[in-house]
């Protein structure tokens, strides 16, 4: 199989072909996802909650991300692999570049950063140094203490700010953007305005791609289940069939449905 590239996702956007992505944290699941047709994987700092058992993503370190990135890369050698830079790992441009180098050497193709226009200079610095960047707007879990919890973002007056943030990140050189927990109407406006692919999670079926935390997709998340999540394993019966169903529903636009969306 040929390596999946950012250019391929760009082509999907241009041809209006939706694509499915998912989080992965280990060799076995990475291989399974790649074998079944999900070729864009994220080593997310969500591992702090799903793998390590913390109540937020804040305790995750760069070393944690690098460890799991190496494992995922071994399982999915041809996948496009995104890796989060965790909380406090990109406070300065110099620190950002050093930490990006660590996860890129571990096997990532791209780093993901949470934040808006204030990150533009950092994104530009990375892009100029051949480090591909995925932005992340809306509900950014590293800011949970600022938001006061996990809440929908981009409603009312905040919509224009979030829209402007998206434009600023693209202008700075970001090549992908994740939108999390934003109203469908705003997600469509941003997706239509940007030339780069937009991946949604809790942003309706109007984005170019979708992503889910794998534990949510298989119904093995303890405690609160996000509105946007769907347990594909419950319907499909086994994990491989669940992955195929997830892909099919994303590509057809069936998932996410109205019941998974915000307004």
From Swiss-Prot:
InterPro entries: Pantoate_hydroxy_MeTrfase (IPR003700), Pyrv/PenolPyrv_kinase-like_dom (IPR015813), Pyrv_kinase-like_dom_sf (IPR040442)
GO CC, alphabetical: cytoplasm
Main subcellular location: cytoplasm
Assigned EC number: 2.1.2.11
Keywords for this protein: Cytoplasm, Magnesium, Metal-binding, Pantothenate biosynthesis, Transferase
Cofactor note: Binds 1 Mg(2+) ion per subunit.
Function: Catalyzes the reversible reaction in which hydroxymethyl group from 5,10-methylenetetrahydrofolate is transferred onto alpha-ketoisovalerate to form ketopantoate.
Binding site for 3-methyl-2-oxobutanoate: 45-46, 84, 112
Quaternary structure note: Homodecamer; pentamer of dimers.
Top EC category: transferase
Biological process according to GO: pantothenate biosynthetic process
Protein name, per record: 3-methyl-2-oxobutanoate hydroxymethyltransferase
One MF annotation (Gene Ontology) recorded for this entry: magnesium ion binding
Source organism superkingdom: Bacteria
Binding site for Mg(2+): 45, 84, 114
Pfam families noted in UniProt: Pantoate_transf
Compartments reported by the entry: Cytoplasm
Required cofactor(s): Mg(2+)
Family classification: Belongs to the PanB family.
Organism lineage string: Bacteria, Pseudomonadati, Pseudomonadota, Gammaproteobacteria, Enterobacterales
